[in-house]
């Protein structure tokens, strides 16, 4: 396992590609034109800032960022402190409460403590226009995040990928199941959670898979910075 590579090494090449330059240019122009784009510019690449390539243990794929005020901050499913947990995250907490002994549902939806333990919270599209779900789909972000997943697949071994819903599962087709652990279920959204997300036990399974490799388990209780 080559642990010396960083996200900077892996992604520097992508940043030279025309598709990536065009994507950032489009988003920059939208912001300049006065449109509200989430997350704020400084937070777009937070998934990579909080979880370095060699630290990744678990990958949770989301779709695109939350498009309501003060929600998105660059980590899939997570919202800023002080913002109520959206419905999908509420179902994630519900599953954790039934899966992990002693888990108590927190009053916040800030998942940065997961990221700091090696859970890469990656959306497949990294920006969105306020109030317009999927408005930045097919701009080029999907190509970028495909390259990210390919880098994880090739540079690391024994990662646990949690793929919830058909979008994430299709995205995960490039993952080699001989090198990594791939757990699949329906999406935690209220539309589909009852079809098999609730009861999937992915969080305890992920910890078992990590411990079998001699790695520390994830503390799935999300902690605000002052609780750390």
From Swiss-Prot:
A molecular function GO annotation: uracil DNA N-glycosylase activity
Q: Which GO terms describe its biological process?
A: base-excision repair, AP site formation via deaminated base removal
Respond yes or no to whether keyword Metal-binding is given for this record. no
Q: What SMART domains does this protein's entry cite?
A: UDG (SM00986), UreE_C (SM00987)
One Pfam family recorded for the sequence: UDG
In this protein, the active site sits at 64 (proton acceptor)
Q: What is its main location?
A: cytoplasm
Per its record, the protein catalyses:
Hydrolyzes single-stranded DNA or mismatched double-stranded DNA and polynucleotides, releasing free uracil
EC number(s) per entry: 3.2.2.27
Keywords of this protein's UniProt record, alphabetized?
Cytoplasm, DNA damage, DNA repair, Hydrolase
Q: Where located?
A: Cytoplasm
The UniProt similarity line reads:
Belongs to the uracil-DNA glycosylase (UDG) superfamily. UNG family.
Function of the molecule: Excises uracil residues from the DNA which can arise as a result of misincorporation of dUMP residues by DNA polymerase or due to deamination of cytosine.
PANTHER family, from UniProt?
URACIL-DNA GLYCOSYLASE
Q: What is this protein called?
A: Uracil-DNA glycosylase
Query: What organism is listed for this UniProt entry?
Result: Pectobacterium atrosepticum (strain SCRI 1043 / ATCC BAA-672)
């Amino acid at each position: 396992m080559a642990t010396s590579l960083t996200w900077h090494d892996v992604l520097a090449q992508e940043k030279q590609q025309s598709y990536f330059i065009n994507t950032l240019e489009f988003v920059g122009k939208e912001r300049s034109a006065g449109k509200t784009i989430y997350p704020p510019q400084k937070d777009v690449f937070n998934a990579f800032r909080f979880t370095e390539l060699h630290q990744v243990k678990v990958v949770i794929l989301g779709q695109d960022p939350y498009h309501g005020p003060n929600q998105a901050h660059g980590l899939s499913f997570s919202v800023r402190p002080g913002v109520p947990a959206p419905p999908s995250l509420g179902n994630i907490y519900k599953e954790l409460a039934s899966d992990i002994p002693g888990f108590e549902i927190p009053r916040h939806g800030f998942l940065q403590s997961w990221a700091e333990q090696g859970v890469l919270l990656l959306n497949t599209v990294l920006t969105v226009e306020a109030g317009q779900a999927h408005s930045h789909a097919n701009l080029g972000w999907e190509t970028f995040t495909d390259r990210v997943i390919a880098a994880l697949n090739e540079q690391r071994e024994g990662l646990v990928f949690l793929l919830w819903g058909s979008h994430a599962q299709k995205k995960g087709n490039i993952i080699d199941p001989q090198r990594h652990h791939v757990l699949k279920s329906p999406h935690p959204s209220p539309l589909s959670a009852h079809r098999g997300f609730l009861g999937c036990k992915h969080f305890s399974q992920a910890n078992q898979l990590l411990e079998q490799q001699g790695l520390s388990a994830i503390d799935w209780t999300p902690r605000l910075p002052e609780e750390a």
